[in-house]
Amino acid sequence: MRYTILSKGDSKSNALKHKMINHMKDFHMVEDAVNPEIVISVGGDGTLLQAFHQYSHMLSQVAFVGVHTGHLGFYADWLPHEVEKLIIEINNSEFQVIEYPLLEIIVRYNDNGYETRYLALNEATMKTENGSTLVVDVGIRGKQFERFRGDGLCISTPSGSTAYNKALGGALIHPSLEAMQIAEIASINNRVFRTVGSPLVLPKHHTCLITPVNHDTILTTIDHVSLKHKNVNGIQFRVANEKVRFARFRPFPFWKRVHDSFIESEDGR
């Protein structure tokens, strides 16, 4: 089994990473950061997001596992005291692969049809560069839906629906549903300006094209990465053809993750 381990970088996570590497040597596992079969993140959800983006070019070949050393690990199945058990499972078991939908983002520019493509595990957001009101036309399946005015828009995956989207009042969507969700960030609604005012859930075969109105520069976030785009013609969102693969060695249902993360964990916290 070829593996690689990405650490959050703090002393606790680094120590755990080195401990795991030493244990894996006992099982003759091969550390391979270029062509791994399994990618283990040690830290929190942010560390797993970094691991996802580092290996997003080979998603069909790798499976991810999270060991969380922080306060909240929605994507992390394993705790520090369980790493020896995890290593034994990796060595001895044919692990189950769980696939989650991803978000495809295509930024189109006014420069000769140039465009860039991104993938998000959690969400993407759109805002203005200087914090002024974002004014955009929102199109769904090639038809004008609304003109949005507000602080911004958040477009999330089902697994990402528990992150920024939840804070915006969006719905929690089970990752077995191939969909994306559009949530408003502080929209302007009055007698003059009007938006739908509710999150929208779009199925896989629907695309959403968001076109800036009188904005030269758009600030986006793709998960944890902030990007500035100039001369934007439009940004298209849809459910990606690719999926992220998680290695499961024991059951950890989505709704149990939600319960443990937001209501009460098993240790009563």
UniProtKB/Swiss-Prot annotation:
Query: Could you tell me where this protein is found in the cell?
Result: Cytoplasm
UniProtKB keywords: ATP-binding, Cytoplasm, Kinase, NAD, NADP, Nucleotide-binding, Transferase
Please, which domain of life does this record's source organism belong to?
Bacteria
UniProt keyword annotation of Transmembrane present: no
Q: Name one GO biological process term.
A: NADP biosynthetic process
Q: What class of enzyme is it?
A: transferase
EC? Answer: 2.7.1.23
Q: What Pfam family is a match, any one? A: NAD_kinase
- MF terms per GO, please? ATP binding; metal ion binding; NAD binding; NAD+ kinase activity
Major localisation: cytoplasm
Which residues does the Swiss-Prot or TrEMBL record annotate as the active site?
D45
Task: Give residues annotated as binding NAD(+).
Answer: D45, G46, N122, E123, R149, D151, A186
SUPFAM superfamilies xref list = NAD kinase/diacylglycerol kinase-like
Cellular-component GO terms for this entry: cytoplasm
| Classification via InterPro entries | ATP-NAD_kinase_N, ATP-NAD_kinase_PpnK-typ_C, NAD/diacylglycerol_kinase_sf, NADK
Catalytic activity reads: NAD(+) + ATP = ADP + NADP(+) + H(+)
Names of the cofactor(s): a divalent metal cation
PANTHER family the UniProt entry points to: NAD KINASE
Q: What does this protein do?
A: Involved in the regulation of the intracellular balance of NAD and NADP, and is a key enzyme in the biosynthesis of NADP. Catalyzes specifically the phosphorylation on 2'-hydroxyl of the adenosine moiety of NAD to yield NADP.
Family in the record? Belongs to the NAD kinase family.
Q: Which NCBIfam families match?
A: PRK04885.1
Give the protein name, as stated in the record: NAD kinase
